[in-house]
């Protein structure tokens, strides 16, 4: 895809002409945002939830089809217990205070990761959100919770190996497409499983085990903006940066 963009002559601002179908977001910087305001880290996580609502509505309006947010990694369990407990309770608050509006805007909510290991109240809140929005046809909001990319691939290989042993598939049948059918993103339409654009906030320049298989050819966008400050204008700027690029997929 050639990343063309145009300028609105009336106001001289760039307007995206290509909107990425699937955007992955590493929502980083909540703790630093809170620290700058002399508040506890959990204060930043709460503000980050507000930012997610804002960005999801903006993306839905722009025509983005999927957003996958890195909400909690398999490595995040090593954080202080109080912080982990607070984060695990956020989906309950999200369901009560934010899901009704997303549902009204036709957003479909799903979760990916090793979700069977989540606390009961966390899993139940997200399951209720999935059930409530399952028939919606707008943007799909994927929550990656207790997610790790290497663990995802490892689990997929184990499942494929078992299916080979059970004679459900032959080794010769194993292709990249088949492996994709065993990953956590298997519920997505095949043409939407891989992010076109991955955004990481807070200035960190790494992917931290986020969608390593699906993101092989994703365009990467890093911004110093802390996640709670990432708003509709910041999303527009990320999409404009995406528009300026030429995706070659190994070609020329």
Curated annotation (Swiss-Prot):
Active site: 28, 76 (proton acceptor)
Domain of life the protein comes from: Bacteria
EC top class, as a word: transferase
Binding site for Mg(2+): 28, 219
InterPro entries attached to this UniProt entry: UPP_synth-like, UPP_synth-like_CS, UPP_synth-like_sf
A Gene Ontology biological process term: polyprenol biosynthetic process
Keywords in alphabetical order: Magnesium, Metal-binding, Transferase
Cofactor note text: Binds 2 magnesium ions per subunit.
Magnesium found in the keyword field: yes
SUPFAM superfamilies the UniProt entry points to: Undecaprenyl diphosphate synthase (SSF64005)
GO molecular function: ditrans,polycis-undecaprenyl-diphosphate synthase [(2E,6E)-farnesyl-diphosphate specific] activity; magnesium ion binding; manganese ion binding
Cofactor: Mg(2+)
Any one annotated GO CC term: cytosol
Enzyme Commission number(s): 2.5.1.-
One Pfam family from the record: Prenyltransf
Keyword hit for Transferase: yes
Binding site for substrate: 29-33, 41, 45, 73-75, 77, 79, 200, 206-208
Assembly behavior: Homodimer.
Job of this protein: Catalyzes the condensation of isopentenyl diphosphate (IPP) with allylic pyrophosphates generating different type of terpenoids.
Family from the record: Belongs to the UPP synthase family.
Name recorded for this polypeptide: Isoprenyl transferase
Organism taxonomic ancestry: Bacteria, Bacillati, Bacillota, Bacilli, Lactobacillales
